[in-house]
Amino acid sequence: MAVYAVGDLQGCLEPLQCLLEHVHFNPEHDRLWLVGDLVNRGPQSLETLRYLYGLRESLVCVLGNHDLHLLAVARKHELLKKGDTLREILEAPDRDELLGWVRRQKLMHYDAERNVAMVHAGIAPQWSLKKALKHAAEVEQALQEDQLYGAFLDGMYGNEPAKWDNDLQGVTRLRVITNYFTRMRFCTSDGKLDLKSKEGVETAIPGYAPWFSHPKRKTRELKIIFGHWAALEGRCDEPGVFALDSGCVWGGSMTLLNVDTLERHQCNCDAVGHAANGLVKSAQAGTATNPQAQEPRQ
């Protein structure tokens, strides 16, 4: 059995199918891990969700900020934004089935056999593996329990509080947990978030650094797979940390990682997220090559 992890899809189905065909993915034997942001901005958000739903028995997903945005818009807790490509999902006859499936996905996945965690954006440097799983479960419970769901979506948006505190309660507590797992790029060594900076690691403001680079990060013995940060172009020099968002929806590429061998495969994408000539490049981890994404990241 092979386990493959793929970076942000954002409604770009063609490159995913190209990659899975390239590695001869067999859903009867292999497993597919997805780092979240399954939908939005790309040309095939509805088709992507339907395709993934059909693969659900062979699939592990964690939720990204765009997936949570979809749930909020569907419940009318948030309005569609310029550039969103979610309307076709909201108007689909099978929307409730698809959205119900999205609600049941995780915020963090941990494979104990491989000692590998997968999240969308990152893990707060001050959290251990045990604490990270515990806090992810708090948000997962809010997503899956009807009596908590609406209040969570109502209070999910916002940049404050910018730092974790064990005494936080209610929706405020859930918001900061969600921001760590689905929006984080830069933070201080004690976890204070900068949610405005979205470019490369060299753009960190004084006192801040990429979440994965802090020397005292409590998950250094853990392998971590993440997406979200398109400006990294699928590259991360931190040992044991694997960045998979290579800017497919911005004309970069979509990246697939064999979780066991660490071999990478990338499908080049055009400016709107379609596969570009079906071209797939293969390389060892850390040697990804793809065009630089030129659009602003979210």
From Swiss-Prot:
Q: What is its EC number?
A: 3.6.1.41
Keyword field contains Hydrolase: yes
| InterPro entries named in the record | ApaH (IPR004617), Calcineurin-like_PHP_ApaH (IPR004843), Metallo-depent_PP-like (IPR029052)
UniProt keywords, alphabetically: Hydrolase
| GO molecular function terms attached to this record | bis(5'-nucleosyl)-tetraphosphatase (symmetrical) activity
Q: Which CDD domains match?
A: MPP_ApaH
Catalysed reaction equations from the record: P(1),P(4)-bis(5'-adenosyl) tetraphosphate + H2O = 2 ADP + 2 H(+)
Looking up PANTHER family in the UniProt record yields:
CYTOCHROME C5, PTHR40942
HAMAP family linked: ApaH
Entry similarity comment: Belongs to the Ap4A hydrolase family.
Q: Which purpose does this protein serve, as stated in its record?
A: Hydrolyzes diadenosine 5',5'''-P1,P4-tetraphosphate to yield ADP.
Q: What is this protein called?
A: Bis(5'-nucleosyl)-tetraphosphatase, symmetrical
- Species of provenance: Pseudomonas savastanoi pv. phaseolicola (strain 1448A / Race 6) (Pseudomonas syringae pv. phaseolicola (strain 1448A / Race 6))
